[in-house]
Amino acid sequence: MRFAALALSAVLLAACAPKSAAYISPTPTPIPTPAAQSQPSPSPQPSPTPDPTHVFVIVMENRSFAQVAGNSYIAHLATQYGVATNYHGVSHPSLPNYLALTSGSTWGIADDGFHALPAGGLGSELSAAGIDWRAYMEGMTRTCFNSPYPYALKHDPFAYYGASCPAQVVAFSRFASDMSGTVPRFVWITPDLCHDGHDCSNAVAESWLAQTVPLILATPAWQDNGLLLITWDEGEDSANSVLTLVIQPNPLLHQSSRPYNHYSLLATIEDELGVPRLGEAAQASPMSDLLATPPVPPLRHNQTG
């Protein structure tokens, strides 16, 4: 993984070169496949960071780490904020990964069909704790169960818990206006089947991110100790590697090679919002080394005599 991180650094340094206002695509550089998936080591659940505010999550589709790391806007974000270089999806196809991200379990599901699961999941947990949240589904023009393409029910995990459409799951058309008003403590964003990269190119998906992410970064909700997490549901390589960005106002570490997965991301969300961890997230390592928390002083070797 050290070689993979160094190779990524070469790509990201290219993105840091002086440029005009428009982003300039760096010269594509092959990036070695990240190491095969290893389970994150169990860790005690830490206390939430002081005064946690808002957490935003964007889930993109079907790209391995190397397929997106060199993209212009993504490389720009990775040079400015945190990037996990040893992060993996937990299953295939899409649905079990979305369920893992929102409940700490794949529920043994290995397809993208509809499954009526018990009520619960992250949304219910937040509601029970009195934390306001909203999930924005791009392309959802009717209810969560009967909206046509390019909306995809399999990318709306909140509809599976209790087989219902929570009131907090809304159309993405509300997103821009909501960001200029009162922003919920937790925000989930699912792009439509084109903008998430599922049916369209990297360039289209990256352009969507370049339009959407600045709307989040411009909010006081993010600027005041907020956290934006961008990940991909599953990779297309044998290791199921995906790139994950950890975007905070004052990051301390740009790259982490620690082994993380979707349970780690859920643990991070729950720790930041101060709620108990669900399912496998209870045993996962949160992405604490990429968060903007006070650094640990370096160890010093004091010689005497």
Name each model feature, range by range:
Residues 9-10, 158:
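Residue-level signal for mature regions of secreted extracellular proteins and peptides
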Residues 1-7:
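Sec-dependent signal peptide recognition
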Residues 44-305:
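Flexible, surface-exposed loop/gating regions in the mature catalytic domains
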Residues 19-49:
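Ser/Thr-rich, Proline-interspersed low-complexity disordered segments
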Residues 12-15:
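C-terminal motif of bacterial Sec signal peptides marking the signal peptidase cleavage site
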